[in-house]
Amino acid sequence: MRKLLLIIGMFFMMAIVGNAQRKRAFMVGISHYDTALTGYQWNNINGTNDVQLLSPILKKQGFYLSTLLDDQATYQNITSLLSTFTNQTKKGDIVYLHFSTHGQPVEDINGDEEDGWDEAIIPIDAYKIYKKRVYEGKKHLLDDQLNTYIKKLRTKIGPSGILYVVIDACHAGTSSRANDETVRGTKVGFTYNNKVFKPSSQKKSHYKVDASAKMSHVMYLEACRPDQVNMEIKVKDRRYGPLSYNISQALQTKPLTTNAAEFLNSVKASIMNGGYWPNNQNLVTETSF
């Protein structure tokens, strides 16, 4: 009888462990864009610093990390690892996606964007300029494609978990250094028909995302509005994306849980009081709650 109770107890414990809420993070950081891979078209930034800053904090909070840095962060590697990461996600997981890269507006060809431009995350091997039969945009990670992964993640996580998506990039930057400052992104649109990108001024800093009883909630944190530049900050002689740095500060006091609103308040408090947020740059949030 005692042996039977022991076996039943072991199965019960295994069931509890198997259904325990897991914490998982997928992070991409690129610094050294200035390579022959893209004909030296992009300036270098400091995206790897962001991932290196956040990784030990998330590990301490029990997150399992999947990271791609610099040369690892090709389009193929990002999409392949993100597919695997998504497929391995389970009900109730707390999932954190993070991109510290360049961004670029891309001419919309399927007509789903009001302003005529998609937004893209730029892998290490994506060119800045369209050139027929040489580079036609296949290595740009478009927001439409990223949204496909996000919908699948939310479905797999279900209503008992949460998804965070952090974009510390920019789709309207000047891609240049001025006064010892580094900007992420470019104001040059990736266009197939010589279309000129003209960012429209936007006042909104919060958007609603569709919610579903069968999906997890999601919160996007984005470093700036579409018409603004994402200016890196300097802390103790190291440069970071401002959003990444302020998230790191918020995590010191408020670990990531399913309470996304509470965490957002901590990030905003760091931005307001920490002294490391660029002028004329607004945090943008998108939430399903």
Predicted regions: what is each one?
Residues 4-5, 165:
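Residue-level detector of intrinsically disordered/flexible regions characterized by low predicted structural confidence
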Residues 5-18:
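Hydrophobic h-region of N-terminal signal peptides that target proteins for export
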